[in-house]
Amino acid sequence: VLLSVTLWEFGVCMIYKDIEEGDYNRSWTGGGVFAAEFHGQDLNDEQAQFYTNFFKNHVFNYLNAEITQKVLPPYYYMVYDYHALYSFGTMQLKSEMSFYTDNLDFWVTCLEGDVNPLTFAQLVRPKTSEDYLMCRGVILKEIFEKAIEVGNIVVPEEFNTGIDYQTEITYKVGYENDDNYYVKRGFPGIMYTTFNFSDLQSVTKINPQTNFLQYINLGMRYTKEEYEALRPSSKYPLVH
């Protein structure tokens, strides 16, 4: 079932029900000692409307066809209680997943789910502005990363002015005043699976494309005032 939110300009079909279990598991991970398979539930009408509004206002509202061409998959599943189930012999462990983007045919977003009976963890739909920021951020950063990879977003030549990608950096607490401290060198840090920055621990883990992506993430994650308070421009001019 295709949602009315689907815009053909983005080339993706948003699907929220009649998803078969096999659809989640076209690619299996694991094997040997343990294996993992993916599960999720269809949305009801109220949930579908909430997800639809979320994608319209917090994802597609920040995109255009030039960015998403060759980036988004044909299908995007919006589901409830998406999780990986790991099997260890006769034992099974559930791991909640808010998104999945490692398949060429489909991606998945899950905004809420059941309580994990073992860990009591639970995905809860966003309510505050900070919640929405984090939810849309993890999706948009994946889209922008892939857009850079396929060439839809090109790093401007002038972006690398003053940034040294060869000399090793420092990152540990207590070295913030060192000239080679990564933020002083023009590296805001690096985002992995969450929408928060981690320390950049080696210059070998960064290149112009990856660093440019981090600046895109930086612009989404913080306001100018928030980042000034966190990383004063008087101390870290290269990241401003």
Label each PLM-derived region with a short phrase.
Residues 1-65, 232-240:
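Acidic/polar, low-complexity intrinsically disordered N-terminal segments immediately downstream
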Residues 16, 22, 27-29, 96-109:
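Short, surface-exposed, charge-dense and proline/glycine-enriched linear segments
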Residues 28-33, 79-81, 108-113:
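Short loop/turn segments at strand-loop or loop-helix junctions that form parts
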Residues 44, 64, 119, 128, ...:
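Alpha-helix initiation/capping motif
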Residues 48-105:
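Auxiliary, metal-adjacent structural segments of Zn-dependent hydrolase domains
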Residues 104-162:
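Active-site recognition of the HExxH zinc-binding catalytic motif
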Residues 163-240:
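Metalloprotease/metallohydrolase-associated module, dominated by Zn2+-dependent proteases
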